[in-house]
Regions:
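Intrinsically disordered, low-complexity, mixed-charge
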Residues: 1-90
Length: 90
């Protein structure tokens, strides 16, 4: 299983983005979390198979109808960083 960190930039706070991510992650069987960051972006930590994480990345680039995603940055999550079992909203 791979673990990735996505930073989603744009108009992504105050539009139900984290709850939308939770629904997508739950449907895909992804473990991790979503949280708002002070700079206005949303951080998503996700663990799953490569194909499932690729689908999640595609979905994050679209976002829910009220969001305006400008870009999604992707990076690896170090092995020592614990990923929650299930999917949490912080």
């Amino acid at each position: 299983m791979a673990a990735l960190r996505f930073l989603v930039h744009g108009h992504v706070q105050g539009v139900g983005f984290r709850w939308w991510v939770w629904r997508q992650a739950t449907r895909l069987g992804v473990h991790g979390l979503a949280r708002n960051l002070r700079d206005g972006s949303v951080e998503v930590i996700a663990e799953g198979s490569d194909s499932v994480l690729a689908e999640l990345e595609r979905l994050l680039g679209q976002g829910p109808p009220a969001a305006e995603v400008e870009r999604v940055e992707k990076s690896q999550v170090p092995h020592e960083v614990p990923v929650p079992n299930g999917f949490d909203i912080k």
